[in-house]
Amino acid sequence: MAIFRIDEIRNMSSEELEEELRKLEVELIRERGAVRAGGAPEKPGRIREIRRTIARMKTVQRERVRK
């Protein structure tokens, strides 16, 4: 799953944004599950990056609603 920059997120349609957000949330659950199962994550900073990207996406969604 790609980590998106804010300009890439703003250029997405609302439907595309929803779809990518769902994919990232599933990936975050999978990564957290792997850590809780006792395994070391392949990329330790991945969870943090996923969380930040989700926050960026939700921010853009909220900006669109408020307009």
Swiss-Prot record:
GO terms for cellular component: cytosolic large ribosomal subunit. It comes from Methanothrix thermoacetophila (strain DSM 6194 / JCM 14653 / NBRC 101360 / PT) (Methanosaeta thermophila). One of its GO terms (biological process) is translation. Coiled coil: none annotated. Belongs to the universal ribosomal protein uL29 family. This is Large ribosomal subunit protein uL29. Keywords: Ribonucleoprotein, Ribosomal protein. Pfam families: Ribosomal_L29. GO terms for molecular function: structural constituent of ribosome.
